[in-house]
């Protein structure tokens, strides 16, 4: 997995490529822990995410909770396959998710 973070003021976009699973989740967890406390908006760009496991879903929830009370958290450029995982788990009811 590769993560490219882009910061514009207090807004951060993380472009995540590859698989987000048990082996790669610690890398994203480290990125989330390093977020500036002044970050008001977080976007996960999943344009190149091929797969997400329960470990990845756990980090999505962690990011959602971390951004609670701020401008927000959303996920963009989600493939149909990854969107199906969010839909089956009900995450699409809580989190702003935009398909490709």
Positions of PLM-derived features:
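STAS-typified acidic loop motif
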Residues: 2-29, 51
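Amphipathic alpha-helical interaction surfaces in cytosolic regulatory modules
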Residues: 22-94
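Short acidic-hydrophobic, aromatic-tinged amphipathic segments that line or gate anion-handling sites
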Residues: 96-100
